[in-house]
Amino acid sequence: MNRLPSSASALACSAHALNLIEKRTLDHEEMKALNQEVREYFKEHVNPGFLEYRKSVTAGGDYGAVEWQAGGLNTLVDTQGQEFIDCLGGFGIFNVGHRNPVVVSAVENQLAKQPLHSQELLDPLRAMLAKTLAALTPGKLKYSFFCNSGTESVEAAIKLAKAYQSPRGKFTFIATSGAFHGKSLGALSATAKSTFRKPFMPLLPGFRHVPFGDINAMRTMLSECKKTGDDVAAVILEPIQGEGGVILPPQGYLPAVRKLCDEFGALLILDEVQTGMGRTGKMFACEHENVQPDILCLAKALGGGVMPIGATVATEEVFSVLFDNPFLHTTTFGGNPLACAAALATINVLLTQNLPAQAAQKGDMLLDGFRLLAQEYPDLVNEVRGKGMLMAIEFVDNEIGYDFASEMFRQRVLVAGTLNNAKTIRVEPPLTLTLEQCEQVLKAARKALAALRVSVEEA
């Protein structure tokens, strides 16, 4: 039977939500009611499948850790008042921490003036953010298109590469195995995980995949495409594969890819949605080897964990194909004043507090600690890898990885696997994590591994 719309029900639900938004604390009964409501509404109106993948489950099987508010810069507090050190970082959005006061203040100040732009008048913050990114990014990157997410920034990069290369008769794209570039149709064509691709086949034509880190395979593919007339428009890469399991390519791989792109007249698109904004110990991961892309994709941490924003930054030569008709690719909310205020404040914090350098220092500390633990627990841990504050602990199987995430949750540390894969647990905390909190994380990991060894031996 079709359900009739109910304005009264919608009004009551929205009023109840607004009342909750105003509250800073909940009493015990309110907490219980909210937990129950959230579970019910996820099941009935969001997607029941999410309940199966959430790691925040108590020993009794209750989803007791419904997010309520940020604690400090590096912690979250649930509806029961329990505080968790965040080593997940919203999959890389909280580089400057939770509710960073500089970012929040910038957004609040802009909100008091004008939240969204008119679409007709020139908006100052979009201009200032574009100028800032032109100064911050490497090489000849100069012009920016703004959007709302990483997927959108990749879509824009693909369209921009097509617009630039189509008159040159180049239509093929090369991506890599294990890549994740998003889940909209164009971005998904570059993504390499069958779980996400298969239900939506056929995807965009012209996408090829080669093994990540294999420069010979890249050269062979470029050469074969040229021989068959399928000339390559662009190569799209993550400098470090995030969702693929924090996979680092061999030293020299990115410069070699850049050289091949120049040789074959292909553009180089670097997807730094997850590795950018200081995450790996440099402002952008490509700077570790001084690689300069033709197009750079940014998002996630660009908004400071306060506002969603993505950016596609390109050289003047490439971006100029949009000069004659700037409406060829646009988005209503892209580059809105609130998002631009957040991004400008985020960049300011990253630079004034030298957070990329802090990420390098603290990342080395955590990686060294995790590697020592891996040596103590070779029966549980296969490998520890990473760069800066983007790390992964690879376990011997999915079950051990899932149990590790659950044990860390019980120790009040949030971690999670890569998408649909608990064998590799990602550690991606805010760059503002204190040295004391780094020590707490390592102590929690030691306790979690000790508990896992006992449970494995008893099984």
Swiss-Prot record:
Gene Ontology terms for molecular function: diamine transaminase activity; identical protein binding; putrescine--2-oxoglutarate transaminase activity; pyridoxal phosphate binding
Keyword annotations: Aminotransferase, Pyridoxal phosphate, Transferase
Catalytically driven reaction(s): an alkane-alpha,omega-diamine + 2-oxoglutarate = an omega-aminoaldehyde + L-glutamate; putrescine + 2-oxoglutarate = 1-pyrroline + L-glutamate + H2O; cadaverine + 2-oxoglutarate = 5-aminopentanal + L-glutamate
Entry's Gene Ontology BP terms: L-lysine catabolic process; putrescine catabolic process
Pathway: Amine and polyamine degradation; putrescine degradation; 4-aminobutanal from putrescine (transaminase route): step 1/1
N6-(pyridoxal phosphate)lysine found at: K300
Enzyme category, top tier: transferase
Residues given in the record as pyridoxal 5'-phosphate binding sites: G150, T151, Q274, T332
EC number: 2.6.1.82, 2.6.1.29
Coiled coil segments of this chain: none
Record carries keyword Translocase: no
Cofactor: pyridoxal 5'-phosphate
Pfam families associated with the record: Aminotran_3
Family per record: Belongs to the class-III pyridoxal-phosphate-dependent aminotransferase family. Putrescine aminotransferase subfamily.
Record's function text: Catalyzes the aminotransferase reaction from putrescine to 2-oxoglutarate, leading to glutamate and 4-aminobutanal, which spontaneously cyclizes to form 1-pyrroline. This is the first step in one of two pathways for putrescine degradation, where putrescine is converted into 4-aminobutanoate (gamma-aminobutyrate or GABA) via 4-aminobutanal. Also functions as a cadaverine transaminase in a a L-lysine degradation pathway to succinate that proceeds via cadaverine, glutarate and L-2-hydroxyglutarate.
Protein name (database record): Putrescine aminotransferase
Species assigned in the record: Klebsiella pneumoniae (strain 342)
Gene encoding the protein: patA
